[in-house]
UniProtKB/Swiss-Prot annotation:
Gene that produces this protein: tsaD
Species, as recorded: Rhizobium etli (strain CIAT 652)
Cofactor binding summary note: Binds 1 Fe(2+) ion per subunit.
NCBIfam families xrefs: gcp_kae1, T6A_TsaD_YgjD
Name used for this protein in its record: tRNA N6-adenosine threonylcarbamoyltransferase
Any single Gene Ontology cellular-component annotation: cytoplasm
Ligand binding (substrate): 141-145, 174, 187, 288
Cofactor entry: Fe(2+)
């Protein structure tokens, strides 16, 4: 293995086009040499969500220049890069095709190995880049396409303990915002309105709370919000703020129950891991300050470290893709063949039951 490998990462699974260069030394320490992300928010905001065809075209238009910029910011050329890592799933198939085909072309032309990376694995391993975290640990992934509680045992070794049985949490935020006439993306808009709201005005349901299994459900909560809004329409600004605050409180209480049970299970299964156990949160919804505070308090109560990587590394980015490639390289995983195909569905836990449905931001995995 190259003693100080350097990887170019490419991410195009949804509505961010990203490229990054990351290197790792023999002790596992990393350096982010560049991190370039182009959001497609303006392209999709008029539609209230991500339009797959528009996303794919935007990736085509932007990716080559972003890769050049990532190399320039890192002050390296392709000759200085040891491998290419590109997201190959899960996600929107059009975007995945753009990124993976670009990665293949670069790997072929430059004579570099290619790592086809699972987007979820990128999220799962980010805390090892930012915090030097050791295995095992728990990860809560909360985004527009996924809500999963995952046991991370090692690189390529994952067990899904819980997942949404309907809407992802980010999807619930977006749909609630749209219902209330708030702008896209919905998460930040709902959080802003909630700051001025009365969280006790509406007693929204907390689906699956109290159940032993660790799954999530948010469609019933979304329906309750719609019915409450219809009952008091037309809505004043204060009504909207109160609904948002009550919605967030219901989610916080749901996560407190679901994740609390997960932390207890972790302690039962790993009673003596030699260090303080950790809960990692990732995904765009991880930016929500109320949810972070809930998880921090839960971890404090249960004797866990709470790790939330910087927001730029919680949302979709190419740093995590490059890092996942480096992690695989470090344990001797062979590169992928150049005929590897993108996968719209690609669960981290190959033994997990297949999920039903197709989320707002792509196939559920």
């Amino acid at each position: 293995m190259v003693p100080f490998p350097r990887i170019l990462g490419i991410e195009t699974s949804c509505d961010e086009t990203a490229a990054a260069v990351v290197e790792r030394d023999a002790e596992g320490h990393s350096r982010i040499l560049s991190d370039v992300v182009l959001s497609q928010l303006d392209e999709h905001s008029a539609y209230g969500g991500v339009v797959p065809e528009i996303a794919a075209r935007a990736h085509v238009e932007a990716l080559d220049e972003l890769i050049e910029e990532a190399l320039m910011r890192a002050n390296v050329s392709l000759a200085d890069v040891d491998a290419i890592a590109a997201t190959s799933g899960p996600g929107l198939i059009g975007g995945l095709l753009v990124g993976l085909m670009t990665g293949k072309a670069i790997a072929k032309a430059a004579g570099k190995p290619l790592y086809a990376v699972n987007h979820l694995e990128g999220h799962a391993l980010t805390a090892r880049l930012t915090d030097g975290l050791s295995f095992p640990y728990l990860m809560l992934l909360v985004s527009g396409g996924h809500t999963q509680l995952i046991l991370v045992r090692g690189v390529g070794d994952y067990e899904r303990w819980g997942t949404t049985i309907d809407d992802a949490l980010g999807e619930a935020f977006d749909k609630t915002a749209k219902l209330l006439g708030l702008p896209y993306p919905g998460g930040p808009a709902v959080e802003r309105m909630a700051r001025d709201g009365n969280a006790g005005r509406f007693d929204f349901p907390r689906p699956l709370v109290g159940e032993a299994r660790l799954d999530f459900s948010f469609s019933g909560l979304k329906t309750a919000v719609r019915l409450a809004a219809q009952e008091i329409a037309p809505l004043s600004d204060q009504d909207v703020a109160d609904i948002c605050a009550s919605f967030q409180r219901a989610i916080s209480r749901t996560l407190k129950d679901r994740i609390g049970r997960g932390l207890q299970r972790f302690k039962r299964e790993f009673p003596s891991i030699g260090e303080t156990p950790a809960l990692v949160v990732a995904g765009g919804v991880a930016a929500n300050l109320e949810l972070r505070a809930t998880l921090q308090g839960l971890c404090d109560k249960n004797g866990f470290r709470f790790i939330a990587p910087p927001l730029s590394l919680c949302t979709d980015n190419a740093v995590m893709i490059a890092w996942a490639g480096l992690e695989r390289m470090a344990i001797g995983v062979a590169p992928d063949a150049l005929d590897v195909q993108p996968r719209s569905r690609w669960p981290l836990d190959a033994n997990a039951e297949r999920l039903i449905g197709f989320g707002k931001r792509g196939a559920k995995a």
